[in-house]
Amino acid sequence: MRGVGQLALHSTDPSRAAEFYESAFGFRRRAADDGGVDLELGGFELSFRRAERPARDGMQLGFRVDTAAEVDAWAQELSQRGFALLGPASGDRWEGTRSFRVSDPDGRQVAIFYHYPA
């Protein structure tokens, strides 16, 4: 096994959800039909399937970056492009992680994070 390659999520509006991830994080649309939308980024597939209501079970998606400075750069870029951050980028080497979060159109939290080496 090489790792996780695909995640499928419920969405009340798969096209709207896909547009958020395309615009915010650079995903590319692979396929779309009445039932949903498939996106891809770096070999990872993120799919949205139509549902009457999204599953709100505390799920959070996280995108790992290579440096703490990248966390700050992503936070600044998304904020400047009009995405509402749920709080400023926070955390340091002492805490072990630096991150920030935004909400997607279905209310899921999406984090950009960096883990400092131990």
What are these regions (language model features)?
Residues 1-15, 58-63, 116-118:
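N-terminal beta-strand motif that seeds the catalytic metal site of vicinal oxygen chelate
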Residues 5, 34-35, 59, 96-98:
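Residue-level marker for the onset of beta-strands and adjacent loop->beta junctions
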Residues 28-59, 65, 109-114:
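Conserved short beta-strand elements that form part of the metal-binding/catalytic scaffold
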Residues 2, 8-46:
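Core segments of cupin and vicinal oxygen chelate
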Residues 76, 80-118:
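Vicinal oxygen chelate
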Residues 69-76:
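Short amphipathic alpha-helices within nucleic acid-binding modules
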